[in-house]
Amino acid sequence: MTTHVVVDCEASGPCPGFGSMINFGAFVVEPSLERGYRSPVIEPYCETFDPRAYAAIGLSREQHVATAEASLEQAMKGFAAWLTETSKDRPVFWSDNPAFDWQWINHGFPSAGISNPFGFSARRIGDLYAGLEQSPRNTQGWKNLRRTSHDHDPLNDAKGNAEALIAILRKHDQLEKLIK
């Protein structure tokens, strides 16, 4: 059985090299939504950052530094261990915006000396929704299916996105096909 995982990242910039990943959350896509993972707050590892990125999540650089709990390497090793525990084979990465979230995770794993367990691909929830709804321009409507508030806490955001993905798959009789 392939394990599908929804991931959400918060960062202090638009991409690695222009900011640091602050923290991330993940949920296994399953009806119970019992298996979630919250990374520790990661020490800034890039001197460059965008104050607007911090403002968007209600944090400052000073608060980030003061609340940091782990190095990037420690955070990624913890996530890799959780993925190994929850996945028998290569997990599938899902996100609201994999162009953003996947790049941080993909940068984090090799920075920690770990191969990316997800490989080199990711799936975007909005594209699946638009395709199943047969409405190619409607890539945002799925966000109304979240039950957990989207508040820039990455665990809450990952859970809300997983809830929406499950609702989409149920509506189109695809959930059982995905999780078997």
Task: State where each predicted segment sits.
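Conserved non-catalytic scaffold segment of RNase H-like nuclease domains
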Residues: 1-99, 148
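Acidic active-site catalytic centers that drive phospho-/nucleotidyl reactions
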Residues: 8-10, 101, 124, 157
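Hydrophobic alpha-helical membrane-insertion segments
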Residues: 17, 34, 67, 105-106, ...
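Active-site-proximal helix-loop-helix substrate-binding element of RNase H-like nuclease domains
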Residues: 42-59, 122-162
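Substrate-recognition/cap helix-loop segment adjacent to the acidic, metal-dependent catalytic center
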Residues: 83, 99-120
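Secondary-structure boundary motif
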Residues: 85-88, 111-114, 170, 174
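Acidic, Mg2+-coordinating catalytic module of metal-dependent nucleases/exonucleases
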Residues: 92-98, 103-104, 108, 138-180
